[in-house]
Amino acid sequence: KEKYATPRRTKIIDAILNYDIEETIQKETVLITVTLQGYIKRGSLKTVKIQKRGGKGKTGITTRNEDSVVQTLSVNTHTSVLFFSTEGLVYKVKAWKIPEGSASSKGKSLFNILPLKNHQSISSIMPFPENDEDSSKYQIVFATSQGKVRKNSLEDFSSINTSGKIAMKLDNNDKIIGVKIWKDCLLYTSPSPR
C-alpha cells in the first residue's frame, strides 16, 4: 500500500439515470389485433406470412366462443394508438405498451390497459401520426348509433392524459359506433331521410 499509495483519479458519484424507456424499444412494424369481446394483443409483423394459392392458412389469434377479430392495425412500436370508446372518450397508448402475444394467444383484456368502466367498450382504434405537425392535415369523423355525425381535426387529440379525454359529448342512450379518418369525400346513407 505504501508503495502504490496514489490517490484515486476517477470520481465515483451517485447519479440518477435520466433516460426515456422508449429509447430502449426497438422500432419495428407490429400488428395490433382487437376482438369483439375486448381482447387486444401486439404481434411482430415478421410472424405473418403470405399464403400461397390453395393454402390452409395459419391461426392469427385464438378467440373464445362467439368472439371475433373486429380490428387490426399495422403500426410502428413507437406510434401512439388512439382508442375511441363507445361512451365518447378517447385514450392514447404507445404501441409498445400493448402486451405482446404469440400467434395462438387470445391477448389481454382492454380493461388491463385502459381505464375503462364496466359498460364501456372500444368502437375504433387508429394510429396517431408520429409528427404532431402531420396531425393537423387529417380530419376524423365520428358516427353515433342515433345517426349523428361529427368532424374533428386529429390535432385535437394530440395531448391526452392517462384517464382519457372527452372526444364527443353524447345524448342519453347514444353510443359511438365508428371513428374513421376523413380524406376528401364522405358518403353516408340512411334508410329513411332525416
Model-identified regions with their sequence ranges:
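Hydrophobic core positions in small helical hairpin nucleic-acid-binding modules
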Residues: 1-126, 132-135
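Polybasic, glycine- and aromatic-enriched phosphate-binding surface used to engage nucleic acids
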Residues: 80-83, 141-143, 177
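Alpha-helical transmembrane segments and their helix-helix packing motifs
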Residues: 128-148
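Extracellular/lumenal glycan-associated surfaces
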Residues: 36-37, 85-87, 144-153, 190
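RNA/tRNA-interacting regions in translation and RNA-turnover enzymes
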Residues: 167-173, 179-181
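Short loop/beta submotifs within extracellular cysteine-rich repeat domains
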Residues: 39-42, 90-91, 148-152, 158-162
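Conserved small/polar residues in nucleotide/adenosyl-binding loops
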Residues: 188-194
